[in-house]
From Swiss-Prot:
EC number: 2.9.1.1
Keywords: Cytoplasm, Protein biosynthesis, Pyridoxal phosphate, Selenium, Transferase
Pfam families, sorted: Se-cys_synth_N, SelA
Primary gene name: selA
Reactions catalysed, as given in the entry: L-seryl-tRNA(Sec) + selenophosphate + H(+) = L-selenocysteinyl-tRNA(Sec) + phosphate
Cofactor: pyridoxal 5'-phosphate
Gene Ontology BP terms: conversion of seryl-tRNAsec to selenocys-tRNAsec; selenocysteine incorporation
Modified residues (N6-(pyridoxal phosphate)lysine): K292
GO molecular function per UniProt: L-seryl-tRNA(Sec) selenium transferase activity
UniProt cross-references to InterPro entries, sorted A to Z: PyrdxlP-dep_Trfase, PyrdxlP-dep_Trfase_major, SelA-like, SelA_trans, SelA_trans_N_dom
Role description: Converts seryl-tRNA(Sec) to selenocysteinyl-tRNA(Sec) required for selenoprotein biosynthesis.
Organism of this sequence: Geobacter sulfurreducens (strain ATCC 51573 / DSM 12127 / PCA)
PANTHER family reported for this sequence: L-SERYL-TRNA(SEC) SELENIUM TRANSFERASE
Name under which the protein is recorded: L-seryl-tRNA(Sec) selenium transferase
Recorded family membership: Belongs to the SelA family.
Length: 462
């Protein structure tokens, strides 16, 4: 009897107790499709010569069906364990929210809210009022506005302040970020006319002054957060641009990308200016993201002088890019943590990960490994290694953060197979392969990730 002939038929699988329980909880077509998928996998393994006798046991086959049902009924967008060591991982949703912020979002989502209702006056209010005062308090700006992402913030500002006019920007600041988002394209879409000055590596104050004409509407500075130009370089600083703008009667705008509200240099993380620095030197409009170094939800934040922010609130484009209530709840909750810097550093996950010391990471790795060892079979072996993490999110492209890595080895499973199978689990576990081993970075592992990793490794080793 060949191994193909021992693969069970559909009817026999449907009669198994575990599969009957699945039929009681799920539509029959869903379970039937899972059975056929499991059988296809068994036949493929038989053809490859990797199918084992124990894989054909009733419990093993039913387990496959159960996992396939779980996979097919799971939401497409779901929680993932980030073991990559990239803190602001764009593909994994960037910044996780603080626990109390998650609770605020849940409370707002549960029922109705005062999104656009003034509870004091009993009349229509503005959704932006929930965060404007907070943003002004935290940044020192006169006015603030929020939209759904920073690209939209830049587009809105350019459309409202420089539509049909020239915008002067250094050639070395014409950046492209992920998803082919390019500053020149956004300027064109906003109706602004790009006027490049300087060279890729050197731009001077005189370049801006010489480029100004009667058609000039705005001076733009773009922070090159996702790349670095080193060597023979020169750039015009924000204070210098403000001086030029005041001299020539032109507004100055800065797109600073990540938008950090806390100076992280004391933690060895240098090179990213704070929002407050740009506001304090007189930049008229500053735009930045909510889900990068700020550690909140995806949002585009605009702060600056009232004379230039208020026109944005009346622009027709704002309606198309306005922020929704759940994002607004998450953003307000995150911003409130920043009223106490110590609280923000302790509770905002992104900040907590970025500022973790080497000793904290070693301890975190030891504790995580201890929990894993209690839950996985002996065929799973764990070891700690020194390594480096990355900030991610287009910030600090040259910075490497020392970290502790957890190396995972499973008998009979190659690192490549492990990586592929772990990211297909009910709760996907995403790590990286380096030095011929599958690695999880302690910096980006959350405390409650352990049960999901244990479950995944147990299934992998079975």
């Amino acid at each position: 009897m060949t191994i193909f002939s021992r693969i069970p038929k559909v009817d026999r699988i449907l009669e198994q107790d575990e599969v009957r329980r699945l039929l009681a909880d799920h539509p029959r077509p869903t379970v039937l499709a899972a059975v056929r998928t499991a059988l296809d996998a068994l036949r493929a393994e038989a053809r490859a010569g990797s199918l084992r006798e124990q894989d054909l046991a009733d419990g093993a086959v039913a387990g496959r069906v159960g996992r396939e049902v779980a996979r097919s009924t799971a939401c497409s967008l779901r929680r993932v364990v980030n073991g990559t060591g990239v803190v602001i991982h764009t593909n994994l949703g960037r910044s996780p929210l603080a626990e109390r912020v998650r609770q605020r979002v849940d409370d707002t989502a549960y029922g109705y809210s005062n999104l656009e209702f003034d509870l004091e006056r009993g009349e229509r209010g503005s959704r932006y009022s929930h965060v404007e005062k907070l943003l002004c308090e935290l940044t020192g700006a006169e006015a603030a506005l929020v939209v759904n992402n920073n690209a939209a913030a830049v587009l809105l500002a350019l459309s409202a302040l420089a539509g049909g006019k020239e915008v002067i920007v250094s050639r070395g600041e014409l950046v492209e970020i992920g998803g082919s988002f390019r500053i020149p394209d956004v300027m064109q879409q906003g109706g602004a006319v790009l006027r490049e000055v300087g060279t890729t590596n050197r731009t001077h104050s005189r370049d801006y002054r010489q480029a100004v004409t009667s058609e000039t509407g705005l001076l733009l500075k773009v922070h090159s957060s996702n790349f670095a130009v080193v060597g023979f370089t020169a750039e015009v600083t924000a204070p210098e641009m403000v001086a030029i703008g005041r001299e020539l009667g032109l507004p100055v705008m800065a797109d600073i990308g990540s938008g950090c509200l806390i100076d992280l240099s004391r933690f060895g993380i240098r090179g990213e200016p704070t929002v407050q620095e740009f506001v304090s030197v007189g930049v008229d409009v500053v735009t930045f993201s909510g889900d990068k170094l700020l550690g909140g939800p995806q949002a585009g934040i605009i702060v600056g002088r009232k004379a230039y922010v208020d026109p944005l609130k009346k622009h027709p484009l704002l309606r198309a890019i306005r922020i929704d209530k759940l994002t607004l709840a998450a953003l307000e909750g995150t911003l409130r943590l920043y009223r106490d810097e110590r609280q923000a550093l302790a509770e905002v996950p992104t900040l907590r990960m970025l500022t973790a010391s080497a000793e904290e990471l070693r301890l975190r790795a030891r504790q995580f490994m201890r929990r894993l060892r209690r839950g996985v079979p002996s065929s799973v072996r764990l070891a700690s290694l020194d390594g480096v993490s990355q900030v991610g999110g287009g910030a600090y492209p040259l910075l490497e953060l020392p970290t502790t890595l957890i190396a995972v080895d499973v008998d009979g499973v190659s690192p490549q197979e492990m990586e592929a199978r772990l990211r297909r689990m009910t709760v996907p576990v995403v790590g990286r392969i380096n030095r011929g081993r599958f690695l999880l970075d302690a910096r980006t592992l959350l405390d409650d990730d352990a049960p999901a990793v244990i479950s995944a490794l147990r299934e992998l080793a079975s």
